[in-house]
Amino acid sequence: ALSVTNLSALDATQVGALTTTQTKALTATQLTGLDAADVAEFSTTHISNFANTQLLALTSTNMAALSETQIAAISAPGVKALTATNFAAFAETQLGALTTTQVSSLTNTQLQALNSTKFASFTATQLGALTTSQVSGISTTNLSALDATQFDAFRTTQLQTLTTTQLNGLSTTDISELTT
């Protein structure tokens, strides 16, 4: 097995030459030892083949360094397995790269870990993919951060799951966005 030092010394071409079998064999220790530049060298094929334990081994800094195409390549179960800290490390552009399948797999803990700016970076399509359970778990702060287009993306069944607390937390502007 490659040491962390040896793995880290591979250039992008060498990392790109790793087979699926080799990628799947990387240990948590090896992945934890990589810096952001090293992680950026993994292809979307490599990323899509990472097991949940491998994804969990990536640091928040490494997660924040993933490209949008790498983010989109993570399996939905892989995204769901991320800690709230790792998930909250995603930038707005990375959150925008999540597929609707990935979004619908998110846990309420992950969604609640996002600040209002990051939560508001979800597209209308992504918000429409949220489950009713996810919608009922959105904080009032994050719900208030959405604009009219984003509110319009919610399906009737999603809106019906809003709690009294969530509705009471909406401003008059937010309420008007629900009715436009």
PLM features per residue range, with description:
Residues 1-180:
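General marker for long, soluble alpha-helical cores
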